[in-house]
Curated annotation (Swiss-Prot):
Positions contributing to chlorophyll a binding: 683, 691
Binding locations of [4Fe-4S] cluster: 573, 582
Gene name, Swiss-Prot/TrEMBL: psaA
Binding of phylloquinone, residues: 692
Keyword Ion transport: no
Subunit structure: The PsaA/B heterodimer binds the P700 chlorophyll special pair and subsequent electron acceptors. PSI consists of a core antenna complex that captures photons, and an electron transfer chain that converts photonic excitation into a charge separation. The eukaryotic PSI reaction center is composed of at least 11 subunits.
Species in which this protein is naturally found: Lobularia maritima
Taxonomic lineage of the native organism: Eukaryota, Viridiplantae, Streptophyta, Embryophyta, Tracheophyta
Keywords: 4Fe-4S, Chlorophyll, Chloroplast, Chromophore, Electron transport, Iron, Iron-sulfur, Magnesium, Membrane, Metal-binding, Oxidoreductase, Photosynthesis, Photosystem I, Plastid, Thylakoid, Transmembrane, Transmembrane helix, Transport
Identification of the protein by name: Photosystem I P700 chlorophyll a apoprotein A1
EC assignment: 1.97.1.12
Major location (coarse): plastid
UniProt-annotated binding residues for chlorophyll a': 675
Highest taxon of the lineage: Eukaryota
Amino acid sequence: MIIRSPEPEVKILVDRDPIKTSFEEWAKPGHFSRTIAKGPDTTTWIWNLHADAHDFDSHTSDLEEISRKVFSAHFGQLSIIFLWLSGMYFHGARFSNYEAWLSDPTHIGPSAQVVWPIVGQEILNGDVGGGFRGIQITSGFFQIWRASGITSELQLYCTAIGALVFAALMLFAGWFHYHKAAPKLAWFQDVESMLNHHLAGLLGLGSLSWAGHQVHVSLPINQFLNAGVDPKEIPLPHEFILNRDLLAQLYPSFSEGATPFFTLNWSKYSEFLTFRGGLDPVTGGLWLTDIAHHHLAIAILFLIAGHMYRTNWGIGHGLKDILEAHKGPFTGQGHKGLYEILTTSWHAQLSLNLAMLGSLTIVVAHHMYSMPPYPYLATDYATQLSLFTHHMWIGGFLIVGAAAHAAIFMVRDYDPTNRYNDLLDRVLRHRDAIISHLNWVCIFLGFHSFGLYIHNDTMSALGRPQDMFSDTAIQLQPVFAQWIQNTHALAPGVTAPGETASTSLTWGGGELVAVGGKVALLPIPLGTADFLVHHIHAFTIHVTVLILLKGVLFARSSRLIPDKANLGFRFPCDGPGRGGTCQVSAWDHVFLGLFWMYNAISVVIFHFSWKMQSDVWGSISDQGVVTHITGGNFAQSSITINGWLRDFLWAQASQVIQSYGSSLSAYGLFFLGAHFVWAFSLMFLFSGRGYWQELIESIVWAHNKLKVAPATQPRALSIVQGRAVGVTHYLLGGIATTWAFFLARIIAVG
């Protein structure tokens, strides 16, 4: 840590009334660009309008103005999020069976949408139990509401109204901080203050307030609910907060107040701040007392972290010093210059944030099923499948976004003149070695992982099961994964002596937890089948990384096109008269990377869906016999390609294909429609611009003949636009098809 003399007092960091509020200007399409504001000559205008409306770099080169626009847009985004949340809570209050579900969550399904009868679509209102007819929801909101202590629809109404107020407040803030008091560039670049406030405020105080809410409101209410008390009889949240005796009845140490805290006798609080591990056998979720303890601990960590960086007081860390001190044996100048990059290029900053947030989202996907945080979440199979799938897709998109903005940084913000021998420069100088090695890894993984399957298909086809790679013939056990599982299963009593069970039942060792005759979670066995599919995961992830990383490292120049930086972020080819240079722009790498991301995530969610139905989810008899949904067929069926097609895709598609005439029929229609959207994408991906321009010319001729030709000249989509429309429909169609396939299946059998 470096101690410096105190910095001078902070200057005024906002400009007052920098930009007047003008509805006339906003009403003019394309007001942000001189060219677009002139109005349309050809139909390309509408595409440019959409492409550039939020590309603030193209409106101005002034970093301060760009920063203000981004900052203001963030408030608009928050406003939309609050509006969406309000809608969710309003549906829970107005159209749902939340109170009925709360009284019997094992026999009643969650529903918060009732279809109006107009042309007979009231068939979609299925019987979710308890005499309620509606669409079964799979968002997990009911489980979150119960965990947070919401016991009535009135409370949901109040929260919905509160969220609307916050949405309005955010809209106002977005306007205020752009038009009335806009921060100066120095404010956006003050990273130490930003770290202190975000760490201590958002993460520290945010976690502390949630921990407080859990201890004072959620825990007592959930205690009553678990004991079978009628929600209407449970005291209201404010009564627990105002009346300490109420809490002391449930947790006797409450009667001592804060004395144990100040006398360091903290173990007194272990009634409601526990360290148990495992799942609550009543609800099948993590112990809420463990969760409260966790948030308190997280709050302490982040409150400390939020006091580590040097601001007005001249003590603490400076980010620039930390980065410049970071030198390794092979990294030359190390991280020198990174501080300047990250405070002047928001694309570089965004790229890092997207990569980390995307990875974190995928981590969330894996924890939601292995450590289900909310009561009755683990036995709601449709919600479990939806949450996993949703977080996997989101994580995949965020990581591709990270590569996109890294490439935009390389093209627009990277200045090679003052970058010499730092980490980034050294990576760029040996990019050929990086990419060619990564390419070799992809080829190796592809041939070997796929080869194992092809071997099995061949042996199976020739009737030689004894020569297949399987748990019953030639075993390829995932020994490292099994070792990790075993280590975690043994942790309680050894490395974590206070714990009564391991972090997740999936590690093994523990008993299974069942709620209402359904399996919540049990130890997940790993075998040859998992070994095979995990190497497909490795393959698809490495190919995605290869495409995206090549796009970033060759964004400015390559042997093929040395002056690529001058062509910009997206361009179709290197001009006329230079063949073989199409699909080389940084944008095209993002475009191609999206397809492999889709590949990678698809295999993951298919693996998860089948594995859970085969080895985890199912019912348990009074004698303790578990019957899994697909009867444990994963280990023997998923070791051939044919098995995936026959026993997963085809066998489990029967519910969506046969859904017509039932309450699941909407999924049947979506399955059909989304296939159509996906197929529609191929029209854009497999045909060239000239074909369409030729067609358009003859259609225009017909319009002229009939004297109905428009003033705006029709143009075919540009090559890049066609690819953008193609990949959008490809992903939308593919994801919606999977959604319909998964939900019709799991709602029917789960």
